[in-house]
């Protein structure tokens, strides 16, 4: 898979945080590159699992909390997406409500298994609400539980799919902690600056709207191509190589039009004027990592 060299990306601070929310986002921690765990099998033979941060769950499962909920749900591979619900309250959930595969790409993974791109899609996916700033417990409590359950299910590689801006930080921290505990990960990100700061292992960047790491709604061929590219590009990262953030060669609009940036801003604007969900959620995130990254990585092994 050839990656793009275009340097354009969606700047959440400039497009949303300042003009719409009227508040600066918390400083994003800047980590050193993570150490990688060797992937034991080629992708075509590996069992690949998902870790999504959109808070996907099913009606017979307990709903997750809106913020700092360190629990997760296991989503069986055979459960139809017509039943899935989303506990994450971010305005960009509108995309996932239109097509769950953009945030929880279960159908995409089953298609990649059928096509022989991956050896097998795991029996279940892990799902959290990624609006988390309790980073110590996320790394030392949640990550070990996920690793234990993933290894018991013979998962060889975990694809981490962050959703909102806070998900990109929490998901990156979680991916680093999981990798450090011996389970290879790769992350499919849509916030370039945040991913470049947190440095999740084997990350790739897709210049698509927040909330759509798995592709455009109702475009299954594109969704398969994106997730395949993310997996194949991610696993090509060599242990010991310099960390990088390859840009996947896909555009939201065929002509390259970036009107989707205004759509994302409008989703936040409507929420801010009617519900105030984002600002209320931001007020709950008092734990910050910026300035104490080295101490955190030593303390929490990530």
Where are the model-predicted features located?
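Metallocofactor- and cofactor-centric catalytic cores in central/energy metabolism, strongly enriched
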Residues: 2-181, 185-235, 242-302
């Amino acid at each position: 898979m050839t990656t793009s060299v275009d340097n354009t990306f969606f700047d959440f601070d400039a497009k949303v945080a300042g003009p719409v929310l009227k508040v600066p986002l918390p400083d994003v921690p800047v980590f050193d590159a993570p150490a990688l765990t060797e992937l034991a099998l080629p992708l075509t033979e590996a069992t690949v699992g998902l870790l999504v941060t959109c808070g996907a769950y099913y009606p017979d499962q307990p709903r997750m909390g809106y913020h700092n909920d360190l629990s997760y749900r296991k989503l069986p591979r055979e459960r139809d997406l017509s039943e899935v619900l989303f506990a994450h309250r971010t305005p960009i959930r509108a995309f996932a409500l239109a097509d769950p595969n953009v945030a929880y790409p279960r159908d995409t993974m089953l298609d990649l298994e059928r096509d022989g791109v991956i050896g097998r899609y795991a029996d279940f996916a892990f799902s959290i609400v990624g609006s988390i700033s309790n980073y110590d417990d996320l790394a030392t409590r949640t990550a070990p539980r996920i690793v234990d359950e993933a290894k018991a299910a013979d998962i060889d590689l975990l694809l981490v799919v962050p959703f909102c801006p806070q998900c990109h930080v929490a998901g990156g921290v979680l991916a680093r902690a999981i990798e450090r505990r011996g389970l290879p990960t790769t992350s499919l990100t849509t916030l370039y600056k945040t991913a470049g700061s947190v440095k999740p292992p084997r990350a790739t960047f897709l210049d698509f709207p927040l909330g759509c790491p798995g592709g455009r709604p109702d475009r299954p061929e594109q969704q398969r191509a994106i997730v395949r590219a993310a997996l194949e590009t991610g696993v090509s990262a060599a242990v010991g190589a310099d960390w990088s953030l390859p840009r996947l060669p896909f555009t939201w609009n065929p002509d390259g039009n970036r009107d989707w940036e205004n759509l994302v801003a409008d989703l936040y604007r409507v929420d801010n004027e009617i519900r105030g969900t984002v600002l209320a959620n931001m007020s709950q995130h008092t734990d910050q990592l910026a300035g104490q990254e080295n101490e955190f990585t030593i303390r929490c092994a990530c």
